[in-house]
Amino acid sequence: MVREKITVSTRTLQWKCVESRTDSKRLYYGRFILSPLRKGQADTIGIAMRRALLAEIEGTRITRVKFAKASHEYSTIAGIQESVHEIFMNLKEIVLRSNLYGTCDASISIKGPGHVTAKDIILPPHVEIVDSTQHIAWLTEPIDLCIGLKIERNRGYFIKTHPNFEDGSYPIDAVFMPVRNANHSIHSYGNEKQEILFLEIWTNGSLTPKEALHEASRNLIDLFIPFLHMEEENLHLEDADHTISLSPFTVYDKVAKLRKNKKKRSLESIFIDQLEFPPKIYNCLKKSNIFTLLDLLNNSQEDLIKIEHFRLEDVKQILGILGKHFALDLPKKKF
């Protein structure tokens, strides 16, 4: 455990970790302070940060299970101590760490008798087990246990609402949130005119509290960046009728203006999440640090095809959207 003496800056606003410990492989704790803040600012930041920590950070979980010998979810199999449902519940608790975008497959293939744990899961190279000792099942006889798994990276949680079977696989509830809990408290000083924000974070081990704080902060910044590039548009308020009329202005109308201006800063104000890209393309671009239209135009077709998980069809789809809405194209190669 690491614990530091708390000192408060009187000039520059700064974060500091004042306590850090690992209670277990699946429970990390961190305590942070932010100071100095004016009265009222700590609560504003604390509420937003807690929300971002619990709801905006992505995690990786098992979402579907294919059990070859199971006739239904509540069946039992000779030679396995647990029921199929109990195995599903154990798989639900497995904590994974990855930079995965989208979904991937994993599996378990083992012969009994013996103890089946998380270390027996055969994973793709970009996915790791946080706690390899997590229990899955006990095999009491020399039988073969073969299970197919679907792994997904997402945020929030997925609750199965009905048995949506796909190729004999079963959906399981998945809690993607790597932050198990987050609390904030406020302490006043300086004649009650200044505040210190204390933020406590507990994670499941797939991220450290410091990593979670960094990602939550980045997600909040991403939400507010568009306001830095706002331009005055045709906005008319009719007080008498209590109505608001807005011009039918879209991101594509904005690009029409950009073609006339040809300004680099203007291109930076169009973010890729404003375009019509499918989630897979958007996630891959974001992973490659392509956030704006300008970032995208600085790449060639050859650059895009080198992006992990990108296919030629994805590049063609990007070219189609650029051509249709912006009358823009990407060179095949960089000169």
UniProtKB/Swiss-Prot annotation:
One of its GO terms (cellular component) is DNA-directed RNA polymerase complex. The keyword Plastid applies. In plastids the minimal PEP RNA polymerase catalytic core is composed of four subunits: alpha, beta, beta', and beta''. When a (nuclear-encoded) sigma factor is associated with the core the holoenzyme is formed, which can initiate transcription. Its EC number is 2.7.7.6. Gene3D superfamilies: 5' to 3' exonuclease, C-terminal subdomain, DNA-directed RNA polymerase, insert domain, RNA polymerase, RBP11-like subunit. It comes from Cuscuta exaltata. Residues 264-335 are annotated as: Alpha C-terminal domain (alpha-CTD). One of its GO terms (biological process) is DNA-templated transcription. This is DNA-directed RNA polymerase subunit alpha. Belongs to the RNA polymerase alpha chain family. Keywords: DNA-directed RNA polymerase, Nucleotidyltransferase, Plastid, Transcription, Transferase. It is an enzyme of class 2 (transferase).
